[in-house]
Amino acid sequence: MNKELLQERKKMIYDFICDELYVPMKAKEMAIVLNVPKSQRGELLEVLDALTADGKVEISGRGKYVKSEGKYLTGVFTAHPRGFGFVTVEGEEEDIFIPAAQTNGALHKDTVQITLSKNSSGKRKEGTVTKILSRGTEQLVCTYEKSKNFGFAVPDNPRFAQDIFTPLERSKGGVSGHKVVVEITDYGKNGKKPEGKVVEIIGHINDPGTDIMSIVKGYDLPVEFSQKIMKQVENVSNEVSAADMAGRMDLRDWQTVTIDGEDAKDLDDAITLTKEGDLYELGVHIADVSNYVQESSALDVEALKRGTSVYLVDRVIPMLPHKLSNGICSLNAGENRLALSCIMKIDEKGNVIDHTIAETVIKVDRRMSYTSVKKILEEHDVAEIEEYKELVPMFERMKELAAILRKKRMKRGSIDFDFPETKIILDEQGKPVDIKPYDRNVATKIIEDFMLIANETVAQDYFWQELPFVYRTHDNPDTEKIKKLGTFINNFGYTIHIGQDEIHPKELQKLLMKIDGTPEEALISRLTLRSMKQAKYTTVSTGHFGLATNYYCHFTSPIRRYPDLQIHRIIKDNLRGRMNQKRIEHYDSILPEVAKHSSEMERRADEAERETDKLKKVEYMEERIGQVFEGVISGVQEWGFYVELPNTVEGLVHVTSLTDDFYHYEESSYEMIGERTNKHYKLGQKVKVIVADTDKIMRTIDFRVVRDDVEPDEAVKDEASVLSKMTD
């Protein structure tokens, strides 16, 4: 039984059991009452088992099915390295805390049944795991350690706190220091450790590339494409055929450019821009990937499974094979390419007066880089201007229109968090040689503004057509978090207006503008960001809080994001007159799962990208132990405070390293205060730190504060002395 059918039948049977005329009955009795054929009674049992597992239905002492009285809840367990955990229950506003003594063998990501504790106090609900319904993890990436008679594997993920016992005959010949994939064969109970077997040796911890591959395996990121998919891709032509171009709007004589990073290979968006009188005509042309990825094909199934391309520090794990993403789907200069275009007429106030969405064929004139466009528009580089002289007027118009669009967006309340992204430079061996903030300049902003307006325009168009669609939504912040933020910023003389338990994004935008350039900017910006919710994919257009718009979608990157590819299919069905009732019902049935899965895969990719960045930052700072840097306090907790350096590297100053006083954490003001000296360490404060230690396994960096009255050279000597005592 497929997932959709199971959900449908679960609802039907649950409604039947909840009916006031229902009397408790056994499965066989229920089958007779509901006229379920004998051949389908196994499916009825499957549905009843699922309802029981969900905690919605219970079996009485007489074996009869009754509605659960709420004694049990079902959810997913999230473990903490210190032993306790939380269970996320659908429909519950907050996660339920599970003390370490009440986890009863549950491991990270397990689906569990819990009961609420009677002694739950305050706002936090507590519970006890009563049953493990299903295991969430079958394999783990570990560091293998071999002893004389057995081996054990230490999970990379600190949320799996127990080592896994691994008999030598199941170790695949692993030696100490090998990164391995371990399959759990016995999850252990009553204090017994889990047992497992090595199913893959990734490489030795000291081998180049092993560190990144360990993260890839740890997040279960699919690297290779199957032979079936590669054979399917081999049949795709390297050139656009006349048949493919037939019936499309021909824009090949329009002056067209792509603007991307120098190392980008999958070019999925191109731009055209003209101006007649008071109206700009902006064309955003997106690679027509759906022409080459047929719905429900092996390639499409794999693309949906992946959900997104993953951009790790040293490699890209693509959603589509490179032959497509870098070849026929990439809008390479001088080549005929199929596109889906959103052509907008925009007035001088940034209003979209009219628009056309069409299947097109384009030919890019020049492949531009952000650096080149920046040199032309900001640095007025003579050589670059001469090289691209026929395009310079269009670039000037782009700068002009982007500024208009940005001004309009900001006027309505769009929030722009200008936190620096990281660019990590690696050598040929994969070692980090430089770390710096990513350059956000006039060229990157032009593309950002043009993609945003295209995404908004497409979303609004399909919202009013009332067709099935996938939107990109961002819910309003949690009221309690916003109120807490409002209380905190009062300490600095700032206020935000919260009306009827809701806040308008313009209030947060005005706050960010007020704090721009102030000492408390980093502090308040981070707290504002933390008060907001995550954006996600949905089938209902509930608006995008951060962009202050009622309509938004992801239309512009079908090479690397599945939701974009999905809505391209919907748009083309509509343009071709195929959106009949059958297709509408089809999309209504599949889109909720597409949206949910795509959101999950996006979060997985983001986490993997963050972990590889953290790993390389640790590796970079490992070579700089003993060096002094100036940074800004970026986070304060009871165990210490975090310091971010100008190159975006972040490390912890542990409270135990602050030896000049006894410091306590003041949660209301996010600062550490010395009891004797009254010395303060607070968010946004500049401090000098020395690199004390690094840990590649935990991906952490330890800093120590350098006193203002100590010269850097002396600080290095003092630190070297401390380190030698620690390691002696």
Q: What are the residue ranges of the model-derived segments?
A:
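Charge-lined substrate channels and their catalytic hotspots, especially those that engage the 3′ end
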Residues: 1-283, 290-336, 374-375, 671-672, ...
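Electropositive polyanion-binding surfaces
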Residues: 32, 171, 181, 186-188, ...
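A short macromolecule-binding patch
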Residues: 94-99, 160-166, 649-665, 713-718
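Intrinsically disordered, low-complexity mixed-charge segments
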Residues: 1-7, 11-14, 23-24, 707-728
